[in-house]
Amino acid sequence: MKHIFRALAPMLVLFIFDIVFLFFFFFFSETYWASSILMHFLGGIAAGWSLWRLLSLPSFPVRLPGRIWRIYMVWSTTALIVVGWEWYEFILDRFFGSFHQLGLSDTMFDMALGLFGSGCFCIYLVFFAPTKRS
């Protein structure tokens, strides 16, 4: 359990940091719009990094056949996390009166930033990350 928490720590830290700003400071992202861009991009990177660490654990129950499959799993699972995050913002706007989703184009841009962040991390994994050689 300790290894799973360590693997998910980057995503959890960014999630908690973002929750504080979204929940307690409703108008923070409206006043500082660049923070939304940065948080969605960093959220994609943090989710990708956490999922990569989780898939690399020896105790993880599913073994994928190769590195490319793990990278694909990281990117596609990050896509699910990005959609879930936008649902979270929608619920805050709808039921708590915040203003995080300024419209459909803003929501699509936020999702694209999360996927772009995850894509940047996956490119790092393909070209720059060290691999285990036997």
Where are these regions (language model features)?
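Bulky hydrophobic segments
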Residues: 1-103, 108, 115-134
